[in-house]
Structure formats: structure tokens, C-alpha cells
From Swiss-Prot:
Lineage of producing organism: Eukaryota, Metazoa, Chordata, Craniata, Vertebrata
Region of interest (Disordered), ranges: 304-328
GO biological process: negative regulation of cell population proliferation
Keywords: Phosphoprotein, Secreted, Signal
InterPro entries given in the database record: Cell_Prolif_Regulator (IPR052679), LAS2 (IPR031587)
Gene name, Swiss-Prot/TrEMBL: Las2
Name of the protein in its database record: Lung adenoma susceptibility protein 2 homolog
Length: 365
């Protein structure tokens, strides 16, 4: 043990010994020896450090050889069989006789007394191994009455935490930050519940049950939109009836002039379709259209010549004016007549050219 202590921590000999073995008390004895000597394995040591060093050497031998045993370091000469140091502070029967009542009930007084009187504290081997390297550690005076109360509180807390499962309701006071303070769980009777982990588990289970019940209730009342029946049902919002109204002609009550124009256009288109069948094809070319125009003009001219020979000149003037007015009306009514008028002009020029060429050729003959 001494080798391990030198390897893992470096500290002074006096500080470690004074902190580790400030005092040694016996579990079976009621006091300390008057001469202040320490006995270990039938040997008396004048100081605690020598007894502790002997104990450490035996402990190292016992670790190397499991068959070896170590005894207790005793003050009054008793020898034990196990490496056990008493962890409780023992006082003589008349130790509190001369103390004042205020000192007896003041924990700070006992804390100062234990720190000042280091010989009244004993440690076990495990406690010695857990000490820091510098050897300093803090002590707190714990009386036997306090330990008994603490054990009873622990037992009551465990019993109450187990009984909480059977109790129908319990509450846990919360702080300002909505956090549960440790060991402040109480039930209806006001008893403290020490085991907060079980309370949290029970509370979580209760919340889960409530959430599942709340989710199950609306599903039972109203059908879920994610169910197969709802998905396979007809979607009324997609089959919206659409009413189609018959088209209403715009400006149905037009003037009689527009009606006459539409009739003239229809008649002209019908005549064009009939002439295209006579010319030998539905889609006639421009030459065939000119031929049709020439034929029509020749027929009009022949009829005009016949009327000219029979009627007087005044009648001719009236007829020419009427024809001219009719042509103007046709030009105004049908836009296509403009192109026809231009074609007539071209044809008249062609006819004049033909007549001129024929007149020039006749004198030569």
C-alpha cells in the first residue's frame, strides 16, 4: 500500500499521516488509553505513524500473499482480526455531562470541535485510498440520532413511493421555473416521497394514457379522413355540375342594311362555288377567275347594247346612272367588288389594246 501511495500521489509524510490517522478508535472499546501508546499485533508503538506504517507493510504483504491477514491498530492493547476502522465517532458516557445545552444542539460547535480534535476520527482502508494527494479533507460531525432519523426518513420515502402506485392521485409542488425540486414530492396525506424516478415514470405513463384516450375518442365519434372508406368515397367537390349556356349572338337587332350585306355576301360565295365547279376544279386559279369575269362582262355588255338600240338617249342616261349607283352600292356593300372593279378596268384596257392592234393590221392587209 505504501508503494501504491508513493506512485499515485506525492504528499508529505506528516500531512498524510496526520490526515489519514488523526485518531484511532475501537469498535468494541469505550475509551482511549491513558499513556497514548498504540498496539498492533502485540507490539506497542509510541506514535500513530509507526503503527500505521506497520499496518501498511502487512497490507502490502497480504495483497502479495492472499493467505496473510492484517489486524486492527488498537490504542488500549486489544487485537482484532480484520482491517476495519470504525467510521463512527465514539465519546465516553459522561462526555456530554459538562457541555452546555446550546453547544449540544449547535452543529457548528461540533464541526469546529472535530476539526480541532483530529484524534477523535478514524477511517477505513477504502477511505484512505480515496483521499486526495494533498491529504486535506473536510469532516462533518454526525451524531447517532441524526443517522437514525436519516435511515427512518429513507425507509419512509421508499415505502411512500411504493404506495403511490396504489394511491389514485398525488401532486408534486413545482418551483417558479416549473422544475420539480428534489425530494419534495408529496401525496394527499402530506408524506414525503423520496424516490422521484418512480414518480416521474408513473407521471409519464399517466400522461401517455391520457393522450391515447384523447386521441381515441374523436376517432370513434368522427370518421378519420385517412381511413380507406373516406378515401374511396366519391369526391363531391370534383364532380361540380357545369351549366353551359347557348351562345347568344352579339348585336342581334341590327339594321336592315347589315342584313342585306350578309345576304349579298352569301349569294356571292354561292355563285363563286358554282363557277368553280364549271371551270373544272374546286380550287380554280387566277386565269380561270379572269375568264369568268370576261364572260360575265360580255353578257352584260350585250344586254346593254340591246337596250341601247331600243331605248332613247334619256332612258339610257337614267339606266347608266342607275347602273352606276348600283355599282357604287355594291362597292359599299361588298368589299370584294373593289377588286372586281379593278379587274374590269384592266380588262377594258386589254380590250382597247386588242382593238388597236387589229385596226393597225387591217390597213396593211
Amino acid at each position: 500500500m505504501a508503494k501504491l501511495n508513493t506512485k499515485h500521489r506525492v504528499c508529505s509524510r506528516e500531512s498524510s499521516i496526520s490526515s489519514l490517522l488523526a485518531s484511532c478508535s475501537l469498535s468494541g472499546s469505550s475509551g482511549c488509553s491513558s499513556d497514548g501508546s498504540f498496539q498492533y499485533k502485540d507490539q506497542l508503538y509510541s506514535s500513530a505513524s509507526e503503527a500505521l506504517q506497520a499496518y501498511i507493510d502487512d497490507f502490502d504483504l497480504s495483497r502479495g500473499h492472499p493467505g496473510a491477514n492484517t489486524d486492527k491498530v488498537n490504542i488500549d492493547g486489544e487485537v482484532g482480526n480484520g482491517p476495519h476502522f470504525s467510521s463512527c465517532v465514539l465519546t465516553p458516557n459522561n462526555a456530554l455531562a459538562n457541555l452546555d445545552d446550546k453547544r449540544h444542539f449547535n452543529p457548528l460547535y461540533y464541526r469546529r470541535e472535530t476539526i480541532n480534535d483530529m484524534d477523535s476520527i478514524s477511517l477505513t482502508t477504502d477511505d484512505l485510498l480515496r483521499l486526495p494527494a494533498d491529504g486535506c479533507f473536510s469532516f462533518s460531525h454526525v451524531t447517532s440520532d441524526h443517522r437514525q432519523k436519516k435511515k427512518s426518513k429513507k425507509y419512509i420515502g421508499r415505502q411512500d413511493s411504493l404506495d403511490i402506485k396504489d394511491s389514485p392521485s398525488f401532486y408534486a409542488p413545482k418551483s417558479k421555473d416549473n422544475t420539480l425540486p428534489p425530494y419534495v414530492y408529496t401525496n394527499i396525506n402530506g408524506k414525503k416521497c423520496g424516490d422521484k424516478i418512480e414518480l416521474l415514470i408513473l407521471k409519464a405513463k399517466k400522461n401517455l394514457k391520457q393522450s391515447t384516450e384523447d386521441l381515441a375518442k374523436p376517432v370513434e365519434k368522427d370518421d378519420s379522413p385517412c381511413s380507406l372508406d373516406k378515401l374511396e368515397a366519391e369526391r363531391t367537390w370534383e364532380n361540380v355540375p357545369v351549366t353551359f349556356k347557348s351562345p347568344v349572338p352579339v348585336k342581334a337587332d341590327d339594321s336592315p342594311q347589315q342584313n342585306s350585306r350578309t345576304k349579298c355576301l352569301e349569294d356571292f360565295l354561292n355563285d363563286c362555288n358554282q363557277s368553280s365547279t364549271l371551270s373544272g376544279g374546286k380550287h380554280h386559279g387566277p386565269v380561270e377567275a379572269l375568264k369568268q369575269m370576261l364572260f360575265n362582262l360580255q353578257a352584260v355588255q350585250e344586254s346593254f347594247d340591246q337596250n341601247k338600240s331600243t331605248e332613247p338617249e334619256e332612258r339610257r342616261k337614267q339606266v347608266s346612272e342607275d347602273d352606276f349607283s348600283k355599282l357604287q352600292m355594291k362597292e359599299n356593300m361588298i368589299p370584294i367588288t373593289r377588286s372586281l372593279h379593278k379587274a374590269l378596268q384592266h380588262l377594258s384596257r386589254l380590250r382597247d389594246l386588242v382593238d388597236d392592234t387589229s385596226g393597225r393590221q387591217s390597213p396593211k392587209m
